[in-house]
Amino acid sequence: MASKSMDAVALLKADHRKVEDLFDKFEKAHESERKKSLVEQICTELCVHMTLEEEIFYPACQAEVEDKDVVEESYVEHDGAKVLVAELMESVPDDEFYAAKVSVLSEEVRHHVKEEEKRGEGLFAQARKAGLDLDALGERLMARKQELMEQIESQGLPTMQTRSFTGHRLEQGRPVHSGIHTAAG
């Protein structure tokens, strides 16, 4: 089993490559059904990946890395992606702005990946430098990823929570106010 496990950074980088490949395939696709299928795969992969980072990797980094701002920026970048993912999951390729939303999501994800993987100063480099047990984190990420994939298979994508958009959750592509910030009438 140890030979098949990946450290956390290797696992997250593999996820990055998979999503980049799906975006590349979308750019070359012409048929609506193919585009919709690719977007569903992209959204599923991103949902799982963001959940893994937010539940396991980012908290471990927040406690140990030198530049805490990088972790906070990552949460905000995820929240922006979650809005587009929620919108795309409720859309079809013929909808207005569909292709533009996929394009913007691709740009945002590629920027996020570049920041995380930046040599020497990105979050992954900082995690290594801080001495995090990346093998143990990798095992936790793999176990949680399997749970999430099984959950998605049986129940569909979960409702995603935003962290930096205080008091909001996303349903059908729109922020839903939790009642925390209500005005007295």
Language model regions located:
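Small-residue-biased structural context
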Residues: 1-185
